[in-house]
């Protein structure tokens, strides 16, 4: 659950949403109100936080908090 909390922290900070709004199945655009620039900045923040690189083609597939967690777990 610690990974979820770390991802949630980044999402809350980047998208300026309440922690209560962020669930594993929350969609960045539809549920959390992100636009395309927000998503790019979110991916960059995740890369920095977890010291990983998310290729553009794979970043496009990350639409939910759970998608981000799965990607990070498999790096």
Curated annotation (Swiss-Prot):
The modification O-(pantetheine 4'-phosphoryl)serine is found at residue 36. InterPro entries: ACP, ACP-like_sf, PP-bd_ACP, Ppantetheine_attach_site. It is found in: Cytoplasm. Pathway: Lipid metabolism; fatty acid biosynthesis. Residues 1-75 form the Carrier domain. Keywords: Cytoplasm, Fatty acid biosynthesis, Fatty acid metabolism, Lipid biosynthesis, Lipid metabolism, Phosphopantetheine, Phosphoprotein. Pfam families: PP-binding (PF00550). One of its GO terms (biological process) is lipid A biosynthetic process. GO terms for molecular function: acyl binding; acyl carrier activity. The keyword Cytoplasm applies. 4'-phosphopantetheine is transferred from CoA to a specific serine of apo-ACP by AcpS. This modification is essential for activity because fatty acids are bound in thioester linkage to the sulfhydryl of the prosthetic group. GO terms for cellular component: cytosol; membrane. The keyword Phosphoprotein applies. SUPFAM superfamilies: ACP-like. Belongs to the acyl carrier protein (ACP) family. This is Acyl carrier protein. It comes from Sulfurovum sp. (strain NBC37-1). The gene is acpP.
């Amino acid at each position: 659950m610690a990974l979820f909390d770390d991802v949630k922290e980044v999402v809350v900070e980047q998208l300026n949403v309440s922690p209560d709004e962020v669930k594993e199945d929350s969609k960045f655009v539809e549920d959390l109100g992100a636009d395309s620039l927000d998503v790019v900045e979110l991916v960059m923040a995740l890369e920095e936080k977890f010291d990983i690189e998310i290729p553009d083609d794979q970043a496009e597939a990350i639409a939910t908090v759970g998608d981000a967690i799965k990607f990070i777990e498999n790096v």
